[in-house]
Amino acid sequence: GAQHAYRKGKSTETALHEVISAVEKSLQVNEYSLIAFLDIEGAFNNVIPGAITEALTDLGVDRHLMMLIDQLLTCRTVTSSMGSSTQSRYVNRGTPQGGVLSPLLWNKAVNKILCDLEGGGGCKVVAYEDDVAIIFSGKFPQTLCDLMTAKLARLSEWTESRGLGINPSKTELVLFTTKYKIPSLNPPILNGCRLSFSDSASYLGLVIDKKLSWNLSIKDRVKKATIALYTCKKAIGLKWGMNPRIVQWIYLAIVRPILLYGVAVWWPALSKGTITKQLGKVQRTAALCISGALSTTPTDALNAILCLQSLDLAGKEQAEIAAIPLRDSDQWVSHHTGHASILNGNKIVPTKTDYCVPREYTDTPFETIIPHRNIWLEGPPGPKGAIRIFTDGSKLDNKVGGGIYSEQLNIRQSFRLPDHCSVFQAEVIAIKEALSCLQEIAPAATHINIYSDSQAAIKSLNAITTSSATVANCRKSLHEMAYQFVISLIWVPGHQDIEDNCIADELARAGTTIPLLHDKEDIRMPMATCKLKIKEHFKRLINDRWQTVSLCRITRQTWPNIIRKRTDELCKLSRSRCSSVIRSLTGHWLIGTHASRLGAPYNDFCRSCRDEDEEETVEHLFCSCPALSRRRLQYLGAPFLINISDMSTISPRRIAGFIRASGWDNG
């Protein structure tokens, strides 16, 4: 359907993808796209209950349930108190704010008109809540305007009959084209008002301009992210305020997501230098806030030390990760150009992953038991007299296998899975294989206990929702077998010398050494593994880019590789100590020649050894100053360092301790 709000597998990203795909497709073939971006006023507050009950009737909802919903909507009382005065009144319009049914009821009420608008005439409709985009594409713009007028009239008629409205002044009309000369046109009419064309429109948080250059949207993103960052900056000083770790979290969790919102549809713009420069300014400001570094510190050095991706790479990584679940849920239409080409030719991403549209389960016809470890001292828990089956999964040398064992049913089975599978998948599939064995053997017993040492597998099978196809398939088998048996999934503690579980573990290990059978080849890579591979790929790109930087001479020696663990240790330091370490690692420090360039006070010679021939430099401090040899031995592990590059193996905490002990920390 056209509605993308409050639906499994749909989101603002799917809505934006459909809108931008339609525009890109028409621009590629040198056609026009006319889009009316409008808002249905009073969607949740003013819709009449009759519109909702009419929609429910068309859907064949039970009459008694429909009457109950109608009563809930028409017999509500609102009470307001001020001082000693209290007023109450009945509310018989709209849906309750915060009501769990309200979004669903609105979707049902508006669904019919959205389908009617899409019917015939080449019209495409994309809606998210009450924000609607009506799209026409073709070669003749005036024809598109006339068709749009008819659709707007139909929508206006529907809204008025339901107690709603559309404000022409808030409706944005954009004619998307790459042509410079556009013929004179009569714009569409809405509610007796002739609309005017706009160069851009705001839709679902993005500013979409008529040529899809994304310049206006990037400016808007930068403005919002800057406001958020400077709001936090008030609590950050050079030697006081939030510590670097918290400021780093604020940037990564709040500011950067604002910058990269909707990047799945505008990532091609990241190839433009002007756009990456605008985005980079925000990240540089954040890096200075995190580190307390001097403003002269190169951006590349700050990004490397703080493990911050340049935003062109961060945006493409996020776009790839966002596109995969949309593709696997059939919400993504790939194309050889434009934003929908993000996954084309990508050898890292498989053609399909284990992701599926989230599925909900209203009933669980089997039992799950996670007993305390001590319970096992008394013997296997669960219903007595039941058939016991032990399952396990294993991963050895990047090979994945599973095992099933039951002494009562004489089952000793091993199986192999594709190497991209996870141990979690092996544990779940082992349970499913146990159910298959039950179906083949058809034992006379009615109670079945299936034991697994994976709490994650048992809890996922007991969850009310799942987005894993592996879990969904196993859950389906459990539901089917529950008609024949009383099934209990029971956790068994691993590595406790429980004999049957040890045998299942041995079978799982053996499964990693046997050939992969044809029926297991189609088991797909888990989404988490796919994300990890993408992240590792972009980490390599970041490191490769850092290795090719021609500037940052000192930083490339003191921090030759981008290592997250070292960055985390640095950010755990206090603000003042973190600032001192970064200034020393980059050479952008208020000492010697650098201080002279900035017009800051400095010493003509080394303050420690008092040698008039030795200038204060980072190399002299860390490598050769004889007056600091004992402190260097104490903190850095050697009285003298051969080269400044030896600093790359020393932890930031020890570097901070040495700087403080040397007395140079006022630079």
Residue ranges and their predicted role:
Residues 43-60, 94, 132-157, 178, ...:
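Catalytic palm subdomain of template-directed nucleic-acid polymerases
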Residues 1, 103-136:
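Active-site palm subdomain of RNA-directed nucleic acid polymerases
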Residues 29, 74-75, 128, 197, ...:
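Short, flexible loop/turn motifs enriched in small residues
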Residues 17-34, 115-119, 373-385, 606-613:
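A short acidic-Thr-Gly-centered motif at the start of a beta-strand
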Residues 178-193, 212, 217, 236-252, ...:
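RNase H-like, metal-dependent ribonuclease domains
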Residues 1-100, 104, 108, 136-137:
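Conserved pre-catalytic core of RNA-dependent polymerases
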Residues 83-84, 150-153, 164-199:
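Short, conserved micro-motifs composed of acidic
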Residues 16-28, 145-162, 228, 429-436:
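Inter-domain linker/hinge segments that demarcate the starts of reverse transcriptase
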